[in-house]
Amino acid sequence: NELTYRAYPYLKSRLLHHKLEFFGYDPKRKELYVFNLDTNGKIVGFQTRELESTGGPKYKTWNLERIYDRLKIPHNLSDEDLTAINKISMLFGILRVDMGRDFTIFEGPIDAMFMNNSIGLTGVKKKITDFDEIPTARYLLDNDSEGKNKMIEKIKKGQKVFMWDSFLRQYGLTGKRIKDLNDLIKYEYKNRTGCLENLDQYFSNDPKDMIFL
């Protein structure tokens, strides 16, 4: 694919080379584009990632309003509709997910590509309240202090979160460099432990299970 060939080694290193429809590449800026697609494959938002450091932010997220402004295309939307669409365009996979069954919320779009029926956020620094009233929502945020603190907030409210510590101990992975689902997928690709088959067993909404996060 001529739009992604320069970024192919990076995508392959993260086992994303079979999902090229979600990516583009800007050879001038040396930026990878991660697309938020609807069910028809139309772009409703995107995130860029620097493949060569320039000293600026590694990730930049573009909502639909910003895209239209850059292209100088009038959107002809009311302020209310524009606010709603901008919100949707920052939730990767939101237009492809079935909330009638369990769906998983990740910190970013890359991890969400490795699990069916998932949504990718654009980080967890802001409050995540959009899914608080949806009983089928569950959180698999990063295995770091920021992600775990956010999941502690959620499990205290009775929402399902992934118990990283319990999972990693069970499969002898404590001490491995596994920060997120993509890291886990890469580890499993090399080592074939079978651990991915049992991920569902390590979600809990019991506040007493906070010690296993």
Place the predicted regions along the sequence by residue.
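TOPRIM metal-binding catalytic domain and adjacent DNA-binding surface shared by DnaG-type primases
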Residues: 1-44, 68, 75, 79-81, ...
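Phosphate-handling DNA/RNA-contact segment within nucleic-acid enzymes
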Residues: 30-136, 150-151
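TOPRIM fold recognition
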Residues: 39, 44, 100-103, 109-213
